[in-house]
């Protein structure tokens, strides 16, 4: 099965673990919002450092607006293959379609590296 239509770029495998690690560390030492609705609000308010979106969300319409909104607002975003892994990184026992890192806490250097790497992949379009 191919990637969902909302996946705007291929996240390299060697970047997936740092993204999940950033979520894990930020959720304990910083501030992270869980879920699509919270991620949407963080983008609209301009408070997100990084939006993380799962690639295996069904139906895809649940998160399809997030990449578009991120591009409109200049917010950094990345994809991870599994909503299960994203939920686990958030420290919750259920899946999560999306998450927003508001304050990276001890993960700031990881978030900076991820945002920089994503900007290179996208051709420098990420403003953060």
Swiss-Prot record:
Keyword Protease recorded: no
InterPro entries: eL8/uL1-like, Ribosomal_eL30-like_sf, Ribosomal_eL8/eL30/eS12/Gad45, Ribosomal_eL8/Nhp2, Ribosomal_eL8_arc
Domain of life: Archaea
HAMAP family: Ribosomal_eL8
Name of the featured protein: Large ribosomal subunit protein eL8
Oligomer and partners: Part of the 50S ribosomal subunit. Probably part of the RNase P complex.
One Pfam match: Ribosomal_L7Ae
Gene behind the chain: rpl7ae
GO biological process: translation; tRNA 5'-leader removal
Keywords, comma-separated and alphabetical: Cytoplasm, Ribonucleoprotein, Ribosomal protein, RNA-binding, rRNA-binding, tRNA processing
GO molecular function: ribonuclease P activity; rRNA binding; structural constituent of ribosome
Keyword tRNA processing tagged: yes
Similarity-based family: Belongs to the eukaryotic ribosomal protein eL8 family.
Localization: Cytoplasm
A GO-annotated cellular component: ribonucleoprotein complex
Function: Multifunctional RNA-binding protein that recognizes the K-turn motif in ribosomal RNA, the RNA component of RNase P, box H/ACA, box C/D and box C'/D' sRNAs.
Lineage, top ranks: Archaea, Nitrososphaerota, Nitrososphaeria, Nitrosopumilales, Nitrosopumilaceae
NCBIfam families: eL8_ribo
Main location: cytoplasm
